[in-house]
Amino acid sequence: MKLGISGGAGEAMEGELSFVSPARSSCFSFEGGGSGSPTWVSTVEALLRSPTSSVSDGGGGGGGGYNSPARASSPLQKQIPYCRDAGDFSSLTWASTLEKPLESPSSCISDGRGGGFGSPTSAFPPEKLLISPPTCVSDNRGVGNVGGFPSLPWASSLERLLTSPSSCVSDSRGVGNADGFPSLPWASSLEKPLTSPSSCVSDGRSGGYSSPLGASAEREREVREAEMLLRAIAERYDDCFLRLRDAAAELSDLHRERLRLAAENLHLSLLLEELESEQRKQASAMAPPKLEEDEAAQGGAPKSISIRSPGYLSQKPPQGQARPQRLRVRASQAMEISHPNCLIFVMGNQCSPKEAAAAGDEEDEEDKGGGEVEVEAYRQGAAKTELCNKWERGACPYGARCRFAHGLQELRPVIRHPRYKTLPCQMFAAASGCPYGHRCHFRHSPLRAAAAESFCY
């Protein structure tokens, strides 16, 4: 291995290893493409500080170069002025820093397939690299950047890179961005690029969507639509509330009107009932009497033959005995017995029996030509003293055993009280009428003045 030093007279190396002087540009080269691993080199700071220095792997650009210098045969005391065969090297495990070459505007970091060196493992901050405007970051496929190197997981932030107006964030498929680099999982914040007017955020399936200005406009439009919807709902609610209030008021008015009409209806019904009762009373008072002649012409039969006699007030016979009483009446009055509904009044013997017999003898002497008729009268309740109702309807099931008369020939006269049928009936004038009918002991028709002794009802 030869070590060539250009740019001045060769000087002897000292016993101890010294650093390479950074006064001139220096370069390491090896014969035959390089040898193995010089261990005497502790730092390449001077080499990296040179503007024209380049670091590359064995298969990249440059001359013969050398690979993996891990050892050295002789120390370097002077600086290397220039390099005839600028070689490349890869995998600098002994390099402590790469600050100076990264500060160079033309510096570039690439993988083993392009220019430069690949997969640097030494930890150094990429802030200086990211500050440089032409600096490009790319994946190991070399898309979207000039040099192209894989995503650096040791990068702490992308604030300075993302503050660039032309910065763009895209997914690993390279859509939606100009240069297209994969999504950086180590990016902690995207505040600065999102605030940039020209920034674009894409999901990788389309060419990106509108800027934040468009998103804000769309959001404002949605807010306006929501406000309009809420305003319409509020107006609808107010309208429904007003309608409900009007309906409730109308319902209360209808309820009060119904109560008023019910009260008026009750009052009118009471007045109508009073008027009808008054009309019935007037009609019953002004009704003409029903003449017996009309009933006789219609063929009606008397229910009984009643004879008023003071003998009705005498002592009643024992129960179960029905003995007739012989009464003497005038012949003219006796002839009226055949008239239906005939009532015979026998002038009462209101004195003692002896006086009555004497008075009767005198009357016989006075009325020799007129004559008298004796009539047998029975008390009320005796057999054959009232006409049979079933016989009047057509046929009586009892036949000859019936206790009621089956015709005028079987009808017997009945002794009545002296005041029988002399007073008007109070129940007959009522609207319901008298429940006793023809058996009532009170008069149901007005008494004729002409009938003093005998009259028909």
Swiss-Prot record:
The keyword Zinc applies. PROSITE patterns: ZF_C3H1 (PS50103). The keyword Repeat applies. Keywords: Coiled coil, DNA-binding, Metal-binding, Repeat, Zinc, Zinc-finger. A zinc finger (C3H1-type) spans 382-409, 419-447. InterPro entries: ZFP36-like, Znf_CCCH, Znf_CCCH_sf. Residues 215-276 form a coiled coil. Residues 57-66 have a biased composition (Gly residues). It holds the Pfam family zf-CCCH. Residues 51-73, 102-130, 195-221, 280-329 are annotated as: Disordered. GO terms for molecular function: DNA binding; mRNA binding; zinc ion binding. This is Putative zinc finger CCCH domain-containing protein 21.
